[in-house]
Amino acid sequence: MDITSVTVGLPVTDIEASCLWYGAVFERTEPDLEPEDGVAEYEVGGIWVQLYEDDSAEENPVSVRFGVDDVGAQHARIGSLGIDIGPVECVDGAVNWFDVRDPDGNVLSLFSLVDETGRGSGRDNGADRAL
């Protein structure tokens, strides 16, 4: 099997409200694609996140994990949006992560890998960027 693309579907009860929420989290002003009413898609990190309206979305939440260069910076940025987020958790020598729930209970888990010294991946510590 030669997989050419990955799309993760997330059920939401209100597509417009969810597009505002995901737009803020993904730093986008609008979805990349709206193929039909009640569906919006964002291309992030080489995959597509598809939001689709489903009246029973809150009954079956989905979890999606995203690797980022600096989980601490993303934690601060998303928290500054007024979005309720969990604390940054640490798995010694492996990963730092936190979870955030969308308005329908779907979980986005953001993580950064930790190098041998116990620090972030070293690819981008965000020290030269303002939030």
What is the predicted function of each stretch?
Residues 26-33, 65-67, 87-90:
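Short linear motifs in intrinsically disordered
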Residues 4-13, 43, 56-131, ...:
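Vicinal oxygen chelate
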Residues 2-5, 9-49, 55:
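Core segments of cupin and vicinal oxygen chelate
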Residues 54-56, 90:
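Short polar/acidic secondary-structure junctions
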Residues 1-19, 46, 62-64, 114-131:
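N-terminal beta-strand motif that seeds the catalytic metal site of vicinal oxygen chelate
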Residues 22-25, 78-82:
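Alpha-helix boundary/capping residues
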